[in-house]
């Protein structure tokens, strides 16, 4: 069954990514999409990891757009798409999708809240940015969520203290 093989490669991609082996992760995601070109879980993770590295942003945007079209109320997919738009400098568009993500997630993660702050800041809404950075800072790490690095925690605290966006 091609969908099972696709899911297997997708899981391999996630494992490689967790181990910091991004080239292998991307190869696994590519294989996953060969077996099932509509695997939206693969597309979302692949697109997000590319955006975090600021690599192949057009490819990331295309994949992420497909996930949002497939599941328009999925806050995770909306956050990924908003973040890719942010990385491409499309701040107003990013804000629109981030607002949809926030509306569709009753309990947003630290990452989503920080992304919201970053997007609002770059879209010119500095007070709203500060509000979301503070929410992110106050948010406890969920069981299934990767804990932020010390560097990430410090950067968030700097954003709050300096009331401005600080890039990764």
Positions of predicted regions on the chain:
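Short coil turns that delineate tetratricopeptide repeat
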Residues: 3, 37, 72, 106-107, ...
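TPR alpha-solenoid repeat register
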Residues: 8, 42, 77, 111-112, ...
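Position-specific recognition of the canonical hydrophobic site in helix A of tetratricopeptide repeat
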Residues: 10, 17, 51-52, 86, ...
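Residue-level recognition of tetratricopeptide repeat
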Residues: 14, 48-49, 83, 118
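Terminal, low-structured helical/coil segments at or just beyond the last alpha-helical repeat
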Residues: 55, 110-115, 122, 126-168
């Amino acid at each position: 069954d091609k969908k099972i093989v696709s899911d297997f490669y997708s899981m391999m991609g996630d494992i490689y990514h967790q181990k910091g082996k991004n080239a292998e992760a991307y190869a696994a995601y590519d294989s996953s999409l060969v077996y099932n070109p509509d695997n939206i879980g693969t597309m979302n993770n692949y697109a997000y990891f590319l955006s975090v590295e600021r690599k192949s942003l057009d490819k990331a945007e295309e994949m992420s757009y497909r996930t949002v079209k497939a599941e328009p109320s999925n806050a995770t997919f909306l956050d990924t798409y908003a973040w890719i738009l942010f990385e491409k400098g499309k701040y107003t568009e990013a804000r629109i999708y981030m607002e949809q993500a926030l509306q569709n997630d009753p309990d947003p993660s630290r990452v989503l809240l920080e992304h919201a702050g970053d997007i609002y800041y770059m879209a010119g809404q500095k007070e709203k940015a500060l509000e979301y950075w503070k929410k992110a800072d106050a948010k406890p790490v969920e069981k299934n969520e990767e804990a932020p690095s010390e560097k990430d925690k410090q950067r968030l605290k700097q954003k709050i203290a300096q009331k401005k966006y600080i890039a990764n």
